[in-house]
């Protein structure tokens, strides 16, 4: 058997990343150039700043990925790239680099959905069994996805408004926490008590949709009213109460999805999958099913996950022409 090497590029938001995957499961390198420090003072990602940073470092990331993997461009079988969803300017930088590299080295180009990458990062620790259900939770998405077979993704539930990671960052900004706030809120939540009665939107409705805007608004109103009255609120208790509400919503909807779509494997992926509170609740609430969560290093945006998803597309023969364009609002098939 001839070894297959895929070079994958991810630039959908504020991480520039390049990875090399050997065959289906050997991640030889996964270079990540983070821009978090550049965006902290703005309290969120500035698209123009993100694009400029990608331009500055992407060539070096490609060189480092090849060097760390111990291979050359001549060893590669294909080039994969995230083409959506994400920030259009950021996506275009990665795509331009991928297309130029593929053209110069006479390699096929594999287009990869960013969220498929998050989902397939689970392949790094387990040979996934299909059909499976996935809960994808990140700064831009909250989705329940039914995967009948490798590469066959179908959204069966999603948020009507804010993504869960977006809600974390917004309440973190209200409390004066550093962006991104998810990790700090999780840590503070473990030191506090769930004493504030925040809403759990839509958990009694017979559907698989999420809503976090009401929870976010309730949190902001409580914090604002307390400041107006000169009252002191413990951040630990605020975070514990907020996170308890988030986890209740996620668990209720995930259990409903598992009842509607009987599977043997549940994948939890996306940046919010790094949340320790979520991992603890999964152990408590989800029984008699194999729960697979990618390692922390593959939860955030990275090209390693794109490479795992690309391996599936390679086997299916899904390649793109060099006129491939970015799709910032790219989705899976959509709701039933």
Swiss-Prot record:
It is an enzyme of class 2 (transferase). Fe cation binds at residues 114, 118, 301. Its cofactor is Fe(2+). The keyword Cytoplasm applies. Its EC number is 2.3.1.234. GO terms for molecular function: iron ion binding; N(6)-L-threonylcarbamoyladenine synthase activity. Substrate binds at residues 136-140, 169, 182, 186, 275. Gene3D superfamilies: 3.30.420.40. It is found in: Cytoplasm. The keyword Transferase applies. InterPro entries: ATPase_NBD, Gcp-like_dom, KAE1/TsaD, TsaD. Binds 1 Fe(2+) ion per subunit. GO terms for biological process: tRNA threonylcarbamoyladenosine modification. Keywords: Acyltransferase, Cytoplasm, Iron, Metal-binding, Transferase, tRNA processing. One of its GO terms (cellular component) is cytoplasm. Belongs to the KAE1 / TsaD family. PANTHER family: TRNA N6-ADENOSINE THREONYLCARBAMOYLTRANSFERASE, TRNA N6-ADENOSINE THREONYLCARBAMOYLTRANSFERASE, MITOCHONDRIAL. Required for the formation of a threonylcarbamoyl group on adenosine at position 37 (t(6)A37) in tRNAs that read codons beginning with adenine. Is involved in the transfer of the threonylcarbamoyl moiety of threonylcarbamoyl-AMP (TC-AMP) to the N6 group of A37, together with TsaE and TsaB. TsaD likely plays a direct catalytic role in this reaction. NCBIfam families: gcp_kae1, T6A_TsaD_YgjD. This is tRNA N6-adenosine threonylcarbamoyltransferase. It comes from Streptococcus mutans serotype c (strain ATCC 700610 / UA159). The gene is tsaD.
